[in-house]
């Protein structure tokens, strides 16, 4: 078996900790000792070896103990894992199932394991060449098998596709193991004292890495379905309190949401938290500060805030601050005034970061900004269907930023920079300001340039809005952006909540927004 599978086997079998899984139907937590989880993984391995030993296994479903076990089960069988999301609310079941199996086939996955209603939907599709197995059956066969040696990939991880077509990153067992070890080393994970709590989806690199890092450390982990969080976000705080969690992770919008509506919080104890990772999307310094201050009466330590940087191409984490420092905000001064950017820490062990100042650089008066390039032991072997990358080469991320005294600062995406009248404007700065307008949905704002083909380059802001007075809201948005960003939007487009297209991980699909606006014109 791979070193990744071997190390996880030793850690899970020797662990005295538990995997606690929330049953959404009953709202009860089910306890599964890590050695038991590994026993289920061995059963999944046996099932896979009895079914033609696939090179890759697709997983779809809620984050049950069986699904978590199936990840290690696939690795014991020498197979790669690809995890795809279930249907979103309002989706057509047949179309979702057909699209899911088509995606699996497109990346070479011909064995899929699922359970419950997901399984029934997938089996309703007549797709030749795909074996669809019952995950519950596979995990409870009590069939162990000799692990298989394999030099193939461990994970076929989809990239977000927020600024273009999604691709599939090929992650080797060594890359995954290096990233998990680097993350645990940076935050100092200790199985004897730490408890993790997560609602992040396992098909997303941050959610998968959080679960696997706990398994690697043998630390207790409380795992809830993402749908349970989205149905009632403030339950997250109750889970943290009930579990005595010391570690959690979420994208920026979750912290903003809790901080904004903190008056709804009562009777929780967050005093044990020492690591609250913030990643997956741009960090709002003001929103994160508001969260920390609002949670302080409940025992939260602001030093636990860890805004971080990562991407699927590097397995997950690239830079993470040391716990205890808290949010560091770097002020950048340009022609429109001062802007705050979160400092995202230094590279985890095994990774390197540099800034390439070429044609994509967006200079300003106080910092030299260039494209962020990375390399290291956590890097992907390449994109599926493309040439492999040289492990010694620097990988251009497409993100713009700079290196400050406290570590990496990310300013935005290179292809998203808006150039108007000789100025380079980062959309996230405009979006954070626009989201302060009453009625504008936080995390549902997109700032775009009108493009080179326009006779008059300008700034367009599209936002999901709910309120009685669009005219006043539009005027306030224009005034705020003009005052704080030094640019007057040429147009503001309000759409109904939920209208802006998103990726499966919840990121706004900027190119799709641009296309829809162009079609409307």
Swiss-Prot record:
Record's catalysed reaction(s): a long-chain fatty acid + holo-[ACP] + ATP = a long-chain fatty acyl-[ACP] + AMP + diphosphate; a medium-chain fatty acid + holo-[ACP] + ATP = a medium-chain fatty acyl-[ACP] + AMP + diphosphate
UniProt key word Zinc-finger: no
Superkingdom of the organism of origin: Bacteria
Keyword list, A-Z: ATP-binding, Ligase, Nucleotide-binding
Keyword Zinc: no
Involved pathway(s): Siderophore biosynthesis; mycobactin biosynthesis
GO cellular component: plasma membrane
Family (UniProt): Belongs to the ATP-dependent AMP-binding enzyme family.
Function: Activates lipidic moieties required for mycobactin biosynthesis. Converts medium- to long-chain aliphatic fatty acids into acyl adenylate, which is further transferred on to the phosphopantetheine arm of the carrier protein MbtL.
PANTHER family: DISCO-INTERACTING PROTEIN 2, DISCO-INTERACTING PROTEIN 2 DIP2 -RELATED
Protein name as catalogued: Medium/long-chain-fatty-acid--[acyl-carrier-protein] ligase MbtM
Biological source species: Mycobacterium tuberculosis (strain CDC 1551 / Oshkosh)
């Amino acid at each position: 078996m791979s070193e990744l599978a071997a190390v996880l086997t030793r850690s899970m079998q020797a662990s005295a900790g538990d995997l606690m899984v929330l049953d959404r139907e009953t709202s009860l937590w089910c306890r599964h000792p890590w050695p038991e989880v590994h026993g289920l993984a061995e059963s999944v391995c046996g099932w896979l070896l009895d079914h033609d030993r696939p090179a890759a296994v697709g997983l779809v479903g809620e984050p049950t103990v069986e699904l978590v076990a199936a990840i290690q089960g696939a690795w014991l069988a020498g197979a790669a894992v690809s995890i795809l999301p279930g249907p979103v609310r309002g989706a057509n079941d047949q179309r979702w199932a057909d699209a899911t199996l088509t995606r699996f086939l497109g990346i070479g996955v011909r064995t899929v394991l699922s359970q419950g209603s997901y399984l029934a939907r997938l089996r309703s599709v007549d797709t030749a060449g795909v074996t669809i197995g019952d995950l519950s059956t596979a995990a409870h066969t009590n069939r162990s098998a000799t692990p298989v040696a394999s030099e193939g990939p461990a994970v076929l991880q989809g990239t977000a596709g927020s600024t273009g077509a999604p691709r599939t990153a090929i992650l080797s067992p060594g890359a995954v193991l290096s990233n998990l070890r680097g993350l645990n080393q940076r935050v100092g994970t200790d199985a004897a004292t730490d408890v993790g709590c997560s609602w992040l989806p396992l098909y997303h690199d941050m959610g998968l890495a959080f679960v696997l890092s706990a398994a690697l450390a043998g630390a207790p982990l409380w795992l809830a379905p993402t749908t349970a969080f989205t149905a009632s976000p403030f339950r997250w705080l109750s889970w943290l309190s009930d579990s005595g969690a010391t570690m959690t992770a979420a994208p920026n919008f979750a912290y903003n949401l809790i901080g904004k509506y903190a008056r709804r919080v009562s009777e929780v104890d967050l005093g044990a938290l020492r690591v609250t990772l913030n990643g997956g999307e741009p960090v709002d310094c003001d929103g994160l500060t508001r969260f920390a201050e609002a949670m302080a009466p409940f025992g939260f330590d602001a030093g636990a805030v860890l805004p971080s940087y990562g991407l699927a191409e590097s397995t997950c984490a690239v830079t993470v601050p040391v716990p205890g420092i808290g949010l560091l905000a770097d002020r950048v001064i340009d022609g429109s005034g001062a802007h705050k950017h979160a400092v995202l820490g230094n590279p985890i062990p095994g990774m390197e970061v540099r800034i390439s100042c070429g044609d994509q650089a967006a200079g300003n008066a106080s910092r030299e900004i260039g494209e962020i390039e990375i390399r290291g032991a956590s890097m992907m072997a390449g994109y599926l269907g493309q040439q492999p990358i040289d492990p010694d080469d620097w990988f251009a991320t497409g993100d713009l930023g700079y290196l400050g005294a406290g570590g990496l600062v990310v300013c935005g995406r290179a292809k998203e920079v808006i150039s108007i009248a000789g100025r380079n404007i980062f959309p996230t700065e405009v979006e954070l300001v626009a989201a302060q307008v009453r009625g504008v949905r936080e995390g549902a704002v997109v700032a775009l340039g009108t493009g080179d083909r326009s006779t008059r380059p300008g700034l367009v802001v599209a936002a999901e809005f709910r309120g009685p007075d669009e005219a006043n809201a539009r005027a306030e948005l224009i005034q705020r952006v003009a005052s704080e960003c030094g640019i007057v939007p040429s147009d503001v487009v309000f759409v109904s909540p939920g209208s802006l297209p998103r990726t499966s991980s919840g990121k706004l699909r900027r190119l799709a927004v641009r296309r829809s606006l162009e079609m409307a014109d």
